[in-house]
Regions:
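Structural motif
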Residues: 1-2, 32-35, 73, 120, ...
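Nucleotide/pyrophosphate-binding catalytic subdomain
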Residues: 1-262, 266
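Short, ordered loop/turn segments at secondary-structure junctions
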Residues: 9, 38-41, 145-148, 185-186, ...
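Short, well-ordered alpha-helices that flank and scaffold nucleotide-derived cofactor binding pockets
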Residues: 22, 135, 454, 480-483
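Residues at the C-terminal ends
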Residues: 28-29, 213, 271, 338, ...
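A conserved active-site cap/scaffold subdomain adjacent to cofactor or substrate pockets
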Residues: 254, 262, 267-291, 310-314
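A conserved regulatory-domain signal marking ACT and ACT-like small-molecule sensing domains
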Residues: 285-480
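Conserved small/polar residues in nucleotide/adenosyl-binding loops
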Residues: 484-491
Length: 492
């Protein structure tokens, strides 16, 4: 048995959703499959925007809602054959859309949008799409993920209750049909039963939770790319698909900006040693990327991929009053954690007089506020400088488990950056040597990615196109020297 997850782009158009039908029906011919689907491409954003418009009293929300209705109604007409099945599906989808219409109207009238109502609204995206796909695929049976994906509230956030969820998943799928169809992303509170969700990208997480609970043979994530790439192909034209990654490498790449897999997805299947296979719905015969415990070629390239986070702010806590003082870093990270601020990079001077942390731009102001409050006494006494954020930065990470076996990687990396005039503002490397990350000015990001990719992934030999105008003393000597170094074919 395997679990297959299809993202929004995979169910976003008539052609793509028909491709999903072919892929699933082919897979289910040999074994039972559980299929997890996202909302139709772009619908989640449209639901959120429509909610916000209604909450501000903007009557144009009605036009946005009509577009949501149109997308689903037209999809049914295009992919489901005319007849009783189509009529029944239109009725079922119509009921859900009417519920959604009433919710939007209520928000518009009271001009208020609570988090609970927002969670309810975005759940309709996956509920609508999964019901349509279930009708489209032969022998598919629909299951409501709200009945078995359970969350609890911790630190004002909804998190999975793993024990209860695993128990309910096993009970729900004690007998697996040929095709089980499940809406991704959505869940419910274990105490109140209220609709919750697993966050953007949560459909990947839904699929991983189910795969782990049922000890699936594999988890397939079908998306609109061929797998993990050596770098962002939109920036690096020579980037290519990585055939294999370890769980650790995939996690590092995801944490530093690669959006192929939602980061929390990896742990549940890693714990059960279930391989994750990334495939392209639009190129189903492509090789894709396999994520597993151990790669089959341990002597492959030292680094597997390059990832980046463009919206970086660097916050530095510094001052001579920090030197030799125990607990400064503890206070930094405790204050940030208490306010829900995630830190993805830490760099500390060996003299202990400064610690720099990388956060998302959206968290920078709050991070400065809470740290200035935490160290208010030290700042007033001049022991620590006022804490400010350095903005318009980008973080780049090179990732690969083989780096720990290869000397000179850091030297090659920073040498490449230096030769190309790129200034490194901060850097960090864990003791595991799986990741080297550094911060640069955001204007240097594209150049950084290109020169690093050329250095680590292209041929050891660079091709130079040399043009000589005239063969005088200098030109003639250059031609003669070049000729003596040519490797000529052997003539038999």
């Amino acid at each position: 048995m395997k679990v297959m997850k299809f993202g929004g782009t995979s169910v976003g158009s008539v052609n793509s959703i028909l491709s999903v039908k072919r892929i699933v029906e082919s897979a289910s011919a040999g074994e039972p499959v559980i299929v997890v689907v996202s909302a139709l491409g772009g619908i989640t954003d449209k639901l959120i925007n429509t909610s916000k418009m209604a909450a501000t009293g903007d009557s144009a929300y009605e036009g946005e809602f009509r577009e949501i209705v149109y997308r689903h109604v037209e999809m049914i007409k295009e992919v489901v054959p005319a007849g009783e099945g189509q009529v029944a599906l239109q009725r079922q989808i119509g009921e859900l859309l009417n519920e959604l219409k009433d919710i939007f109207q209520g928000i518009y009238l009271i001009k208020d949008l609570s988090p609970k109502t927002s969670d309810t609204i975005v759940s309709y995206g996956e509920r609508l799409s999964s019901i349509i796909v279930a009708e489209l695929i032969k022998d598919a049976k629909w299951f409501d993920s709200r009945t078995f994906i359970k969350t609890e509230k911790k630190h004002n956030k909804h998190t999975i209750d793993a024990d209860l969820t695993n128990k309910l998943v096993k009970e729900t799928f004690s007998s697996i049909p040929k095709v089980a169809l499940v809406p991704g992303f959505i869940s419910s509170d274990k105490t109140t039963g209220e609709v919750t969700n697993l966050g953007r990208g949560g459909s990947d997480y839904t699929a991983a939770i189910i795969a782990a609970a049922l000890n699936a043979d594999s988890l397939e994530i079908w998306t609109d790319v061929d797998g993990f790439m050596t770098a962002d192909p939109r920036v690096i034209s020579t980037a290519y698909t990585i055939s294999e990654l370890s769980y650790v490498e995939a996690t590092e790449l995801c944490n530093f900006g690669a959006k192929v897999v939602y980061p929390p997805t990896i742990y549940p299947v890693y714990h059960k040693n279930i391989p994750i296979i990334i495939k392209n719905t639009f190129n189903p015969d492509g090789v894709g990327t396999v994520i597993k415990q151990e790669v089959s070629n341990p002597h492959s390239k030292a680094i597997k991929g390059i990832s980046s986070i463009n919206d970086t702010s660097l916050i530095t806590v510094q001052g001579l009053g920090m030197v030799g003082v125990i607990g400064v870093n503890y206070r930094i990270f405790k204050a940030l954690a208490k306010n829900g601020i995630s830190v993805f990079l830490v760099s500390q001077a060996s003299s202990e007089n400064s610690t720099s942390i990388g956060v998302r731009n959206a968290d920078a102001d709050l991070a400065c506020e809470v740290l200035n409050e935490e160290f208010a006494k030290e700042i007033e006494m001049g022991e620590i400088s006022p804490i400010l954020a350095e903005r318009n930065l980008a973080t780049v990470a090179i990732v690969g488990e083989n780096m720990k076996h290869t000397p000179g990687i850091a030297g090659k990396l920073f040498g490449t950056l230096g030769r190309n005039g790129i200034n490194v503002i901060a850097c960090a490397q864990g003791a595991s040597e799986t990741n080297i990350s550094f911060v640069v000015d955001s204007k240097s990001l594209r150049k950084s990615l290109n020169v690093i990719h050329d250095s680590f992934f292209l041929s050891e030999y660079q091709v130079l196109n040399l043009f000589i105008c005239g063969i005088g003393t200098v030109g003639g000597s250059l031609v003669a020297v070049s000729y003596t170094h040519l490797t000529l074919p052997t003539i038999r």
